[in-house]
């Protein structure tokens, strides 16, 4: 008897290779390794808690790129400290140099102050000397002006007095000339008039004989004698004009002296 032996089944053909390979990686498994031990209905979020989402990762990387590393921060701090110290040193150096300059300037000013003070004193003394010379010159010119004015005043006064004296003197001379030229007439009649006339002549001759020789020989008395008149050496008008002239001259001299003392 023959037994029906089963024929071996033919194996299926191998699958064809894919035409293109996917470039994106496969998504991570939703469940971790602990799912094998956990029941199927119990889900675990440990994977999500352990690895943050991609947006959070990108934000953290950007923040880290923005914040400098610790070494860079330390170098920046050291650089800032060095620059502040350099600025302080520069400021102290500039302040010390300014103080030294001030000291040098004060020393120079102290050294040059006696020289300038001497110059100022000499300049002031020169100015005072010039002012004194100007004042003396002004006083001198003022005195000269006063002297000139006094001289002019005196000259005008003398001219006025001489003119008045000449007028009065001319009138007196004219009167004397008229009396000298006038003929002597005897208005009396009879022997009594003749006797009186003779008595007068005798008295007149007696006065002349008793006078000194200088008076008799003077040119004033050598002229014609008027009848019944008296001998006059100087008239009252001449004496008054001479006194006025003398008083005016004395007043002018006193005024000149006073003006000269005031000018000095």
From Swiss-Prot:
List where Polar residues composition bias occurs.
77-97
Q: Which domain of life is it from?
A: Eukaryota
Q: Biased composition, Pro residues: where in the chain?
A: 9-30
Residue ranges for the region (Disordered) are: 1-146, 165-240
Here the segments flagged for biased composition (Basic and acidic residues) are 98-107
Q: Which InterPro entries match?
A: BKI1/MAKR1/3/4 (IPR039620)
* Phosphoprotein recorded as keyword: yes
Q: Biological process GO terms, please?
A: brassinosteroid mediated signaling pathway; lipid metabolic process
Q: Which UniProt keywords apply?
A: Brassinosteroid signaling pathway, Lipid metabolism, Phosphoprotein
Posttranslational modification, per the record? Phosphorylated by BRI1.
Q: Name one GO molecular function term.
A: kinase inhibitor activity
* Compositional bias per record (Low complexity), positions renumbered to this chain: 31-40, 208-219, 227-239
One GO cellular component term noted in the UniProt record for this chain: plasma membrane
Self-association state and partner proteins as the record states: Interacts with BRI1.
Instruction: Report the function annotation for this chain.
Output: Negative regulator of brassinosteroid signaling.
Which PANTHER family has this protein been placed in? Answer: BRI1 KINASE INHIBITOR 1, MEMBRANE-ASSOCIATED KINASE REGULATOR 4-RELATED
Q: What is this protein called?
A: Probable BRI1 kinase inhibitor 1
- Organism, scientific name: Oryza sativa subsp. japonica (Rice)
Q: What is the lineage of its organism?
A: Eukaryota, Viridiplantae, Streptophyta, Embryophyta, Tracheophyta
């Amino acid at each position: 008897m023959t037994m029906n032996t089963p024929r071996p089944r033919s194996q299926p053909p191998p699958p064809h290779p894919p035409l293109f390979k996917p470039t994106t990686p496969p998504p991570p498994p939703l469940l971790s390794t602990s799912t094998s031990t956990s029941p199927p209905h119990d889900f675990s979020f440990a994977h999500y808690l352990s690895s943050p989402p991609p947006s959070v990762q990108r934000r953290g990387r950007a923040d880290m790129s923005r914040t400098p590393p610790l070494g860079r921060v330390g170098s920046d701090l050291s650089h800032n400290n060095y620059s502040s110290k350099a600025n302080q040193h520069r400021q102290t150096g500039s302040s010390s140099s300014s103080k030294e300059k001030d000291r040098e300037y004060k020393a120079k000013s102290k050294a040059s102050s006696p020289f300038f003070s001497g110059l100022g004193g000499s300049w002031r003394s020169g100015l005072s000397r010039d002012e004194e010379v100007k004042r003396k010159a002004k006083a001198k010119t003022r005195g000269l002006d006063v002297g000139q004015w006094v001289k002019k005043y005196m000259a005008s006064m003398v001219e006025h007095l001489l003119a008045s004296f000449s007028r009065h003197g001319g009138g007196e001379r004219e009167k004397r000339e008229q009396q000298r030229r006038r003929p002597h007439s005897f208005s009396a009649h009879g022997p009594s008039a003749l006797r009186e006339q003779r008595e007068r002549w005798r008295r007149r001759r007696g006065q002349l004989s008793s006078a000194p020789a200088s008076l008799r020989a003077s040119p004033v008395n050598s002229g014609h004698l008027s009848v019944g008149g008296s001998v006059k050496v100087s008239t009252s008008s001449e004496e008054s004009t001479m006194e006025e002239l003398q008083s005016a001259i004395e007043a002018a001299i006193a005024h000149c002296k006073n003006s000269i003392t005031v000018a000095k």
